[in-house]
Design a protein with these regions (language model features):
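Polytopic transmembrane helical bundles with strong interfacial aromatic enrichment
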Residues: 2-162
Length: 162
């Protein structure tokens, strides 16, 4: 591998490590917001999208309601908004990892993005159907995403052994 190509990949992998750390911190904040919503926020059952027959249409209405309605708890808006940012950030980290071409980074980043996406779908499903199982799965997927980003931070800085 040429020196310039190796330097480019190392830069991308350093950026991926930075993004992994940022996402890890954001996930911990998200967990705290989610626990507050779960324990203390009152989410009315008559909001737009609740019990929708079409999951995706209902989810769209739920998230729109959570982000824009004066009747939605403000903490829910923060939780949903940070969740959307986590999805975008995790997808960007996956792109950086793929471009950096380190197998461990790629696997952990792609799995982390899938776990965050799955947690988001379960959050939308919780607003749709108000089932505790969705909240439980969201917590499990959070833990799995945290593990993925810890793995990225734990991997050696360079794939090339000196």
């Amino acid at each position: 591998m040429a020196g310039a190509e190796r330097a480019r990949r190392d830069r991308r992998n350093r950026a991926a490590r930075g993004w992994a750390l940022g996402l890890l911190v954001a996930l911990l904040v998200q967990f705290g917001l989610g626990m507050y919503v779960n324990l203390f926020a009152h989410i009315p059952l008559n909001h737009p999208g609740h019990r929708a027959k079409n999951f995706f249409a209902g989810s769209y209405h739920n998230v729109t309601w959570a982000e824009t309605s004066p009747h939605a708890p403000l903490i829910l808006a923060f939780h949903a908004g940070l969740g959307l940012l986590l999805v975008l950030g995790s997808l960007w980290l996956a792109v950086l990892a793929i471009r950096g071409r380190r197998a461990g980074f790629v696997w952990a980043a792609v799995l982390g993005a899938l776990f965050i996406l799955g947690a988001g779908f379960n959050g939308a499903s919780f607003l749709n159907y108000n089932e505790d199982a969705n909240s439980f799965v969201m917590a499990l997927l959070f833990a799995a995403a945290v593990l993925c980003y810890i793995i990225i931070l734990a991997l050696p800085r360079s794939a090339i052994r000196e």
